[in-house]
Design a protein with these regions (language model features):
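P-loop/Walker A NTP-binding module and the surrounding RecA-like catalytic core of P-loop NTPases
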Residues: 1-175
Length: 175
């Protein structure tokens, strides 16, 4: 894994802890280091150690901040230079409580980094993730995973049938 969120306090340590739990190496930069340089180092580490999968954790960003979107575009570019054809999958993580703002977020991120799918988090909260249907119908982006908490087993592969059933079940229980 690449710890390229070098700006949020504790982000690097948090990813290192996950790496230890999962017995996965973590390439990490220093606080406030250029995230693109961390990704270059991580790509080189992965190639040198015959690692097939490299997950790059980047800082959360608002799509309205042009400098942060330019930084994301740079990260996308440098990974492609280090590993031809990469990145092979780009997933945008969206908080289920975001609501319809998530659509414009996904649209602008997709313009910058060619998103392959969505990971929807905080499904354990009050939001039912109604944004799932809008993202799929308006942008054609599939939801790949949904998160129900912060434990290892709380990230589940998205099952559209189970998701729709849970919405209908909740609706029936209300009436």
């Amino acid at each position: 894994m690449a710890a390229a969120d070098t700006f949020r306090a504790g982000a690097i340590d948090q990813l290192k802890q996950w790496g230890e739990r999962l017995d996965v190496p973590v390439v990490a930069g220093k606080d406030n280091e250029d995230p693109s340089s961390v990704l270059v180092e991580a790509c080189r580490y992965a190639k040198a150690n015959d690692i097939d999968i490299l997950i790059c954790d980047t800082a959360g960003r608002l799509q309205t901040k042009k400098n942060l979107m330019a930084e994301l575009e740079k990260m996308y570019r440098v990974v492609g230079k280090e590993i031809p054809g990469a990145p092979h999958n780009v997933w945008l993580v969206i908080d289920a409580n975001t609501g319809q703002n998530g659509i414009s977020q996904a649209e602008l991120f997709n313009d910058t980094a060619k998103i392959d799918g969505i990971i929807l988090t905080k499904m354990d909260g009050t939001a039912k993730g109604g944004i799932v249907l809008a993202i799929k119908s308006e942008l054609g982006l599939p939801v790949k995973y949904i998160g129900f908490g912060e434990k290892l087993d709380d990230l589940k592969e998205f099952d559209v049938d189970l998701y729709l059933y849970s919405i209908i079940e909740d609706f029936q229980n209300e009436h």
